[in-house]
Amino acid sequence: DTAARRIRDAGLVVTGLCRGGMFPAADAAGRAAAIEDNRRAIAEAHAIGARCLVMVCGGLPAGSKDLAGARAMVRDGLHAIMAEARDAGVTIALEPLHPMTCADRSVLSTLGQALDLCDELGAGSGVALDVYHVWWDPDLARQVARAGSRIAAFHVCDWKVPTLDTVFDRGLPGEGVIDIPAIRAMVTGAGYDGGFAEVEILSKRWWAEDADSVLAEIKRRHATAV
């Protein structure tokens, strides 16, 4: 309640709450706990007026090599929470992650896979499109067009060469090899009306810098490289 009040008082828009997901687990108790955790996340997203709950769906359970089984756990978990999400008015935004994170963070690796799940889940589901995770996909343009109004969030940053860490070495827009304006044009052309291209920087290097200076650089690059 305190957080929701402060957000309202500041006149802020909560584009999304990150994150839900992490459904795969080694046993039934773990899977049930993940579902309950996601139900709490839905309630939190509703309380703060978030436009969506971003889903990082989860990787392989410890010791497992069963990729198909993990994806089935994700599917089952999502189906289990959709009624609560619809009742709360919270869009469940599936975020495909780069394949290099498939083992430990998300077995959902392409926009096409995410949209296939959205087709199953129906109303109240959508996708969170992060250029860091999808820029490499040769089918990206077709899948963005397919997504259309189901794009619930749009995240931007850059892929550095070389990349030292697949999670915590993102670049600011313009630092790497992603054609961000081209992808933004696809997203806008598909009908995304969220109004925001959110700069999402997970970077040990940038976190070590002065926060005000980093924010100023983000603003500059958002105006010139996004």
Annotated model-derived regions:
Residues T15-G20, L53-V56, A93-L97, A128-Y132, ...:
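A cross-family glycoside hydrolase active-site/sugar-binding cleft signature
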Residues R19, A103-D104, D169:
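Glycine-rich, flexible loop/turn motifs
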Residues R8, L108-L129, W135-V226:
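Histidine-acidic metal/acid-base catalytic patches
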Residues D1, R19-P24, K204:
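Short active-site-proximal "capping" loops at secondary-structure junctions
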Residues L12, A45, A50, I151, ...:
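A structural motif
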Residues R8-D9, P24-G126, W136, E209, ...:
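Active-site acidic/histidine proton-transfer and metal-coordination neighborhood
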Residues T2-G11, G16:
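Aromatic-lined substrate-binding rim segments of carbohydrate-active enzymes
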Residues G20-A25, L60-A62, K160-T166:
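Conserved radical SAM core fold
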